[in-house]
């Protein structure tokens, strides 16, 4: 009897789930129909405004009233997407004339729940609405949203700030994150800074000016941002790497920077790291082995060959990769292949086999193409 009750209960739960899914399908379809209906109505209105070549005060008031509702804003988003695909320049010009509308809406959406509050900055970022025009009310509101415990609200507010291109507001946003108890993934911050639309040189100077006051985590974010954005910081990055006691994570980022952007004065520092760390700090050694790719020369090849005998697999792997990137031939590695270290020989054979396979694939593609 108990087994039958459990089976009936299970069937009832399954039936309830199926019923719930069916209801959700109808609700979502009805919602999509409403959005499409609203969007078509907005398309007619916007096209008429574009034809008249004038955004009137009445049109701004109409949008200010309508777009306070999230469904209308979503429909307006669909409208702009469709029209932007047809004529980007016209829509950019149209959006530029709507700054008063979006300034007003910034304050309205600040009062709404987290999901709606996150959606509005997304629209600002998506259409670059305030780019180059950091209106104080807008920037203050976006900075307040960066305090939010919700990751979605914070990230969308940050993306909106980056898209506007205000150096001062971007620095303020970083300080909010720096002092916040809410975790924000460092990679997301780095990637966001790469989207900054303003004066990147001025931003870089401001970041260096305040660098020492930031937390270690934020300092690493800044160094990573420089690594992906500009070769103009080599001297400062080297100076950051040189002192004793520098945080390991920051040091790793500095080494990667100097590996991407070759800087001759950094070479003795990099080789010194390998000499000091190869027997007890494999992460330093592995990262530096990769960095030496951009420092070709006999000394570099000798160092990398020596690292092929390192007991750590990651060090050997990176050293072999760098040797191949330096353009070595099979004959250059005879001493390794004929040596007593089986692991060193194996990893280099793997590299050369991999190279042959890629060459064969490229040849096959070349022969098959017309």
Mark where each language-model region is:
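N-terminal signal-anchor transmembrane alpha helix of single-pass membrane proteins
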Residues: 1-40
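N-terminal topogenic membrane-targeting module
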Residues: 26-114
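Amphipathic alpha-helical repeat scaffolds
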Residues: 46-47, 77, 106-110, 142-143, ...
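Amphipathic alpha-helical scaffolding segments comprising HEAT/armadillo-like alpha-solenoid repeats
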Residues: 63-64, 96-109, 132-145, 167-178, ...
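Short inter-helical turns and helix N-cap capping residues of alpha-solenoid HEAT/ARM repeat scaffolds
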Residues: 112-113, 149-151, 181-185, 214-215, ...
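Glycine- and small hydrophobic-enriched segments that form the cores of compact globular domains
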Residues: 138-213, 217-225
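Eukaryotic acidic, Ser/Thr-rich intrinsically disordered low-complexity regions
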Residues: 329-370
